[in-house]
């Protein structure tokens, strides 16, 4: 397994621990809320939650912010723009856009695990305009065409 080092900066509002893998085969690392005061997310509302960290990804890497399944299933709290993308050239604070899809208000406390961050390699592409695309068995079928 290859391991890539990524620089991480603790900002003034940082608290808790740096993101880390929970198990040997975890894909994501938990992000921790770094809000000074509790933030209430009312049912149906969206809030931007600080994490107190900034990162310097190597070029050809991206980070995705994804929901934590426990928050989603127990409280209806998820990442509104899931997955949120952090580009390699972004150097600002990582913030998480949470939405409350539940029926009860939910309070985000400082130090709470609010989302996961997954770091991945990507490739850039160059579009080649064409009037003909190769045929496939699926063709243009989409949006449930292969079953529910």
UniProtKB/Swiss-Prot annotation:
Alphabetically ordered keywords of this record: Hydrolase, Magnesium, Metal-binding, Nucleotide metabolism
Q: What is the role of the protein in this entry? A: This enzyme is involved in nucleotide metabolism: it produces dUMP, the immediate precursor of thymidine nucleotides and it decreases the intracellular concentration of dUTP so that uracil cannot be incorporated into DNA.
- The UniProt record gives the binding positions of substrate as 68-70, 81, 85-87, 95
The entry's family comment says: Belongs to the dUTPase family.
Enzyme class (EC, first level): hydrolase
What is this enzyme's catalytic activity, as reactions? dUTP + H2O = dUMP + diphosphate + H(+)
What cofactor does this protein call for? Answer: Mg(2+)
- Which protein is depicted? Deoxyuridine 5'-triphosphate nucleotidohydrolase
What domain of life is recorded for the organism?
Bacteria
Upper classification of the organism: Bacteria, Pseudomonadati, Pseudomonadota, Alphaproteobacteria, Rickettsiales
Q: Which organism is it from?
A: Rickettsia akari (strain Hartford)
């Amino acid at each position: 397994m290859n391991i890539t080092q990524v620089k991480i900066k603790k900002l003034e509002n940082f608290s808790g621990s740096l993101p880390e893998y929970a198990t040997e085969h975890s894909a994501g690392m938990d992000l921790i809320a770094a809000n000074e005061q509790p933030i209430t997310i009312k049912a149906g509302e969206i809030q931007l939650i600080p994490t107190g960290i900034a990162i310097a990804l190597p070029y050809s890497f991206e980070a995705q912010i994804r929901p934590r399944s426990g928050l989603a299933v127990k409280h209806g709290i998820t990442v509104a723009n899931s997955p949120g993308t952090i580009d390699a050239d972004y150097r600002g604070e990582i913030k998480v856009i949470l939405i409350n899809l539940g029926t009860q208000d939910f309070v985000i406390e400082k130090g709470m695990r609010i989302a996961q961050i997954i770091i991945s390699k990507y490739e850039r592409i160059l579009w080649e305009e064409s009037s003909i695309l190769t045929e496939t068995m699926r063709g243009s079928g989409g949006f449930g065409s292969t079953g529910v």
